[in-house]
């Protein structure tokens, strides 16, 4: 029996930290190969896949203070880090799993990426290409989570999948507290009121206003991404 995906178009948010693998910094080739195959398993269902990547494996905005850089400049440095990750993932998707991939950057740099144009992004998706959005929103003071929510709304994605290293949303940090409880389903407002670190308020509000459900899952568990897209119960869902 042919498996039917629940969603036709998805926005996948990958953190920069995931790219670092076990070493904690830089880009781990093993993760690139792994995530390429995980994405291909979703792509092969006929799903249109757009991706937003963080840059935390290379540079994080709050590091700016330590080196005497102001917040806006530090954020721009972080945006450039996302472009490095986007190019690495583009190469992996094209070389490991042979999927045509386009990088669209919110900060113009025509030699390495196409400029972000909403209609062009949608056209690429319709033509069966994977689209990677780099450069965050193109503005300082906005996180890549907010960029993910914004792009999801702009392209009409039916779901935002936040790929993390934990099994979903917990009532407290599962890495610190072994008795942390997984929350299967929760509303946007509850996430904000409980102070859960799923996404920042700007990103959550964008998803709420545009009725985009958020699935938080452990991307390191093989097949999770595909199961989520098929509508199976994986991780946690934020909606309503």
Swiss-Prot record:
<feature type="binding site">
    <location>
        <begin position="13"/>
        <end position="16"/>
    </location>
    <ligand>
        <name>ATP</name>
    </ligand>
</feature>
<dbReference type="GO" id="GO:0005737">
    <property type="term" value="C:cytoplasm"/>
</dbReference>
<keyword id="KW-0067">ATP-binding</keyword>
<dbReference type="InterPro" id="IPR001048">
    <property type="entry name" value="Asp/Glu/Uridylate_kinase"/>
</dbReference>
<feature type="binding site">
    <location>
        <position position="173"/>
    </location>
    <ligand>
        <name>ATP</name>
    </ligand>
</feature>
<keyword id="KW-0021">Allosteric enzyme</keyword>
<feature type="binding site">
    <location>
        <position position="75"/>
    </location>
    <ligand>
        <name>UMP</name>
    </ligand>
</feature>
<feature type="region of interest" description="Involved in allosteric activation by GTP">
    <location>
        <begin position="21"/>
        <end position="26"/>
    </location>
</feature>
<protein>
    <recommendedName>
        <fullName>Uridylate kinase</fullName>
        <ecNumber>2.7.4.22</ecNumber>
    </recommendedName>
</protein>
<dbReference type="GO" id="GO:0044210">
    <property type="term" value="P:'de novo' CTP biosynthetic process"/>
</dbReference>
<feature type="binding site">
    <location>
        <begin position="137"/>
        <end position="144"/>
    </location>
    <ligand>
        <name>UMP</name>
    </ligand>
</feature>
<dbReference type="InterPro" id="IPR011817">
    <property type="entry name" value="Uridylate_kinase"/>
</dbReference>
<comment type="pathway">
    <text>Pyrimidine metabolism; CTP biosynthesis via de novo pathway; UDP from UMP (UMPK route): step 1/1.</text>
</comment>
<feature type="binding site">
    <location>
        <position position="170"/>
    </location>
    <ligand>
        <name>ATP</name>
    </ligand>
</feature>
<feature type="binding site">
    <location>
        <position position="55"/>
    </location>
    <ligand>
        <name>UMP</name>
    </ligand>
</feature>
<dbReference type="GO" id="GO:0033862">
    <property type="term" value="F:UMP kinase activity"/>
</dbReference>
<keyword id="KW-0665">Pyrimidine biosynthesis</keyword>
<keyword id="KW-0418">Kinase</keyword>
<dbReference type="Pfam" id="PF00696">
    <property type="entry name" value="AA_kinase"/>
</dbReference>
<keyword id="KW-0547">Nucleotide-binding</keyword>
<dbReference type="InterPro" id="IPR036393">
    <property type="entry name" value="AceGlu_kinase-like_sf"/>
</dbReference>
<dbReference type="InterPro" id="IPR015963">
    <property type="entry name" value="Uridylate_kinase_bac"/>
</dbReference>
<comment type="subunit">
    <text>Homohexamer.</text>
</comment>
<feature type="binding site">
    <location>
        <position position="60"/>
    </location>
    <ligand>
        <name>ATP</name>
    </ligand>
</feature>
<keyword id="KW-0808">Transferase</keyword>
<dbReference type="GO" id="GO:0005524">
    <property type="term" value="F:ATP binding"/>
</dbReference>
<feature type="binding site">
    <location>
        <position position="164"/>
    </location>
    <ligand>
        <name>ATP</name>
    </ligand>
</feature>
<comment type="function">
    <text>Catalyzes the reversible phosphorylation of UMP to UDP.</text>
</comment>
<keyword id="KW-0963">Cytoplasm</keyword>
<dbReference type="GO" id="GO:0006225">
    <property type="term" value="P:UDP biosynthetic process"/>
</dbReference>
<comment type="similarity">
    <text>Belongs to the UMP kinase family.</text>
</comment>
<feature type="binding site">
    <location>
        <position position="56"/>
    </location>
    <ligand>
        <name>ATP</name>
    </ligand>
</feature>
């Amino acid at each position: 029996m042919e498996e039917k995906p629940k969603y036709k178009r998805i926005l996948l948010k990958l953190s920069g930290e995931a790219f670092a693998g076990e070493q904690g910094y830089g880009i781990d080739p093993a993760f690139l190969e792994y995530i390429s195959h995980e994405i291909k398993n979703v792509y092969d269902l006929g799903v249109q896949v757009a991706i937003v990547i963080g840059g935390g494996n290379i540079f994080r905005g709050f590091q700016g203070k330590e080196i005497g850089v102001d917040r806006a400049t530090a954020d721009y440095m972080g945006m450039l880090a996302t472009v490095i990750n986007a190019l690495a993932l583009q190469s992996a998707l094209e070389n490991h799993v042979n999927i045509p991939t386009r990088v669209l950057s919110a900060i113009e740099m025509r030699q390495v990426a196409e400029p972000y144009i909403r209609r062009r992004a949608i056209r690429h998706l319709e033509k069966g290409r994977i689209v990677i959005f780099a450069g965050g929103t193109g503005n300082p003071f906005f996180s890549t989570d907010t960029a993910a929510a914004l792009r999801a709304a702009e392209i009409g994605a039916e779901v935002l999948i936040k790929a993390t290293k934990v099994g979903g949303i917990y009532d407290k940090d599962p890495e610190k507290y072994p008795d942390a409880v997984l929350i299967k389903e929760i509303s946007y407002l509850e996430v904000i009121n409980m102070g859960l670190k799923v996404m920042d308020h700007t990103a959550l509000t964008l998803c709420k206003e545009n009725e985009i459900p958020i699935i938080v899952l452990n991307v390191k568990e093989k097949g999770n991404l595909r199961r989520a897209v098929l509508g199976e119960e994986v991780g946690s869902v934020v909606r309503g």
